[in-house]
């Protein structure tokens, strides 16, 4: 890397080795096209290791449900629900041109922030904190100074799981019938709200970036992740959030069944907390529990200043709900890569589910066919997109 200087402080932490790049937008709008704040497709040029690259981005149009809502609480405890317009959002996925194996997950809200894979290597990109400058830092995760080197783990253990023999991937037939649609509610607890100093815009950006990242990983499992709502416990927690992940998970599941499910149509809920769970645990979820009112839930600790690492923990816990177990020795997601369902989160950027995860998810869906994820929800861009009549299914269907 032709890097400048030594260490730099970015949102993701202290970065020791980085390249300064100046992304140049090269998108040309078709004649007569209406200028959106964030176009459906964009391209940026910049250099990595001195080599020019073209980053092609397409808006993640399925990110929000048609009736997406945001909920917070007033000081006197009243619930305030808003339905913000999210069609013109700034979350994209894409690839590097002329690199068939490349992927990218980027937020373009204030500069470019996210990650991309180029020639098999994963890089992070984010704007540098220089006013009136287009400068961005490009770096590898290994160059972020680690806050602590302790192992971080999922709390799901073998007593939570029931292992069954796994078929080979080649024995499973895949067709478009396998496509599923998971509407998710993210709940941000009071400790997390306080951690971000009550800045709801910052919290929203943090959560949206995570969902944009995991939606890319879930495409491999033929599952669309759609955000139904973001609820912030702005005044106080609505359950007892404890350092015991197990107790917190149980309380959260009970609260979902008694409260959340009756006011928001969704299939799965995940609690994000700044509470430090006991031991090395950073997340916990029920296994094979999708669509169950009390058990289609997980709890995730906001354990890193690197958004991607928390996103992968979220992806991991949701996968448990979908009947996916921890990877064992022979599971693989490509040579040299750690996969999403590794029981330990180590210090590298993880992006892929293993062959074992794919098979377990497909088997769970084939056998159990959880009904709540069958329907294709109305997307935020439905109004402007011609669709056939049978796609306009009613979204409010969950637990009648």
Swiss-Prot record:
Entry EC no(s): 3.4.24.-
Annotated Ca(2+) 2 binding sites: 387, 390, 392, 394, 400
A GO molecular function held by the record: metalloendopeptidase activity
Disulfide feature: 291-372, 331-356, 333-339
Manner of cofactor binding, per the entry note: Binds 1 zinc ion per subunit.
Keywords recorded for this protein, A-Z: Calcium, Disulfide bond, Hemostasis impairing toxin, Hydrolase, Metal-binding, Metalloprotease, Protease, Secreted, Signal, Toxin, Zinc, Zymogen
Active site: 317
Keyword field contains Kinase: no
Cofactor(s) named in the record: Zn(2+)
Name of the top EC class for this enzyme: hydrolase
Binding site for Zn(2+): 316, 320, 326
SUPFAM superfamilies noted in UniProt: Metalloproteases ('zincins'), catalytic domain
Entries under Pfam families matching the protein: Pep_M12B_propep, Reprolysin
An example Gene Ontology biological process: proteolysis
Domain Peptidase M12B: 180-377
Positions that bind Ca(2+) 1: 183, 267, 372, 375
Propeptide feature: residues: 7-176, 378-400
Keyword Methyltransferase attached: no
Signal sequence segment: 1-6
Tissue expression remark: Expressed by the venom gland.
GO cellular component: extracellular region; plasma membrane
PANTHER family: ADAM A DISINTEGRIN AND METALLOPROTEASE DOMAIN (PTHR11905), DISINTEGRIN AND METALLOPROTEINASE DOMAIN-CONTAINING PROTEIN 28 (PTHR11905:SF32)
Function as written in the Swiss-Prot or TrEMBL entry: Snake venom metalloproteinase that impairs hemostasis in the envenomed animal.
Family to which the UniProt record says this protein belongs: Belongs to the venom metalloproteinase (M12B) family. P-I subfamily.
Oligomeric form and interacting partners: Monomer.
Record's protein name: Snake venom metalloproteinase H1
